[in-house]
Swiss-Prot record:
Gene3D superfamilies: Ribosomal protein L28/L24. GO terms for molecular function: structural constituent of ribosome. This is Large ribosomal subunit protein bL28. Residues 1-21 are annotated as: Disordered. InterPro entries: Ribosomal_bL28, Ribosomal_bL28/bL31-like_sf, Ribosomal_bL28_bact-type, Ribosomal_bL28_sf. It comes from Shewanella piezotolerans (strain WP3 / JCM 13877). The keyword Disulfide bond does not apply. The keyword Cell membrane does not apply.
Length: 78
């Protein structure tokens, strides 16, 4: 399973760890992804999404029905 948010598209990014001596070693910054089920009232079923916490806030704001419609318009299977 890839580490990509289905709602926002957030992916891992790369950067550096910096020690006290300013030595740089490469590292990855991973998005805060959660597996979550949402109830779709119109379809009378649950949908499982792998979303970031930012994606959860977007769903709280817009509503799951609107977000799922946007995902389907993008061609993503939900």
């Amino acid at each position: 399973m890839s580490r990509v948010c289905q709602v926002t598209g957030k992916k891992p990014m790369v950067g550096n760890n910096r020690s006290h001596a300013k030595n740089a070693t490469r590292r990855r910054f991973l998005p805060n992804l959660q597996n979550h089920r949402f109830w779709l009232e119109t379809e009378k079923r649950f949908v499982k999404l792998r979303i970031s916490t930012k994606g959860m806030r977007i769903i709280d704001k817009k509503g799951i029905e609107v977000v799922v419609a946007e995902l389907r318009a993008r061609g993503e299977k939900v």
